[in-house]
UniProtKB/Swiss-Prot annotation:
Region feature (Disordered): 53-84
UniProt similarity note: Belongs to the protease inhibitor I14 (hirudin) family.
Signal sequence bounds: 1-20
Source organism of the structure: Hirudinaria manillensis
Listed Gene3D superfamilies: Thrombin Inhibitor (Hirudin), subunit I (2.70.10.10)
Described function: Hirudin is a potent thrombin-specific protease inhibitor. It forms a stable non-covalent complex with alpha-thrombin, thereby abolishing its ability to cleave fibrinogen.
Keyword Signal belongs to the record: yes
Name of the protein: Hirudin-HM2
Amino acid sequence: MFSLKLFVVFLAVCICVSQAVSYTDCTESGQNYCLCVGSNVCGEGKNCQLSSSGNQCVHGEGTPKPKSQTEGDFEEIPDEDILN
């Protein structure tokens, strides 16, 4: 019984590890994809450039990260407009 539990735990760990996404170091030519939103993994003074084909590491400014939403970003809608 203990061996079965151990096997199930081992199997679950293997599945989780195999599904993990790994990002490689970005190269000088910027052809490797890189994580941009949330954290910057480009390194070596490079920044992420967002594009529809994927995120690439580039020298320079890159694409600014989206600012987080705050309460002041939205206009309040009066209750009577919602109910009508």
